[in-house]
Amino acid sequence: MKTAVQGALSCTGVEVRIGAKTLLANASVELVPGRVTAILGPNGAGKSTLLSVLAGQREPTQGRATLDGRSLADHGMPTLALRRALMPQESAVAFDFTAQDIVALGRYPHRRAPTRDEDAIMAEAMALTDVTALAPRILNTLSGGEKARVHLARALAQLWHPRPDGASRWLLLDEPTAALDLAHQHSAMRLLRAWAARGVGVVAVLHDLNLARRYADEVVVLGAPEGLRQGATAEVLQPALIEAVWRMPCQPVTGADGVTQYLFG
């Protein structure tokens, strides 16, 4: 039996069905902290479903998801909330919360043992995602990109300090760059790489293959003819696979910075 990597977030043989519809089939991944992993695939491939299973938000119909080799359900939601933060696709809220209120929600799991720097944590998280000026604004009056940056600040605030026991921390992000302008896409991905360098596991659903190629250490590709593919970004994201999964021919080009990107069409 394979030994679980300490701090690893994994799923094995996961299938998710709703009625007769299969949302995800036979998905097995093992993720280790300190790396940026991009989950890629065409629409409907099951990317968000896989992320929700890894977050412990969705119980798989078959298979299991684990953290440190233990079922996510065994950890319990209060404990998981101290170790993983989820940024969903949908960013609207039902009440008139301000941007600062939303970021403060990231500190809610720590309410039983607050630190002395709670206000500073929120301020620094908002500065990192360039939303300080938006603090008093009602979230639902913001643009999609502004909302996304507020929710990213919330996720960062939730995981701000390393765990006293050294346990791994995980940022699980569903299309964090989809609504962002070009500059904020790259600043957000650089920020996520910086957090990975601090030992945080970063898992992001992305649609932009060039962002994944530039910033992700590894990719999980759904929708390939041979099934799920996981591995180092440069090894997996080859033109033949891209054309097979997305049905788009592409040409790799290397920029002046040495990073390979893709031209499509």
Language-model segment annotations:
Residues L9-C11, L24-N26:
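Conserved structural motif at the start of ABC-family nucleotide-binding domains
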Residues L40-P42:
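The feature captures the beta-strand-to-loop junction immediately N-terminal to the Walker
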Residues A55:
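Helix-to-loop junction immediately C-terminal to a conserved catalytic motif
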Residues G63-S71:
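Conserved ABC transporter NBD signature motif
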Residues S71-A85, F95, R112-A113:
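ABC ATPase NBD coupling module
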Residues D117-L134:
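Conserved ABC ATPase "signature" region
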Residues V219-A234:
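H-loop (His-switch) and adjacent beta-strand-loop-beta switch element
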Residues Q238-P239, E243-G265:
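ABC ATPase nucleotide-binding domains
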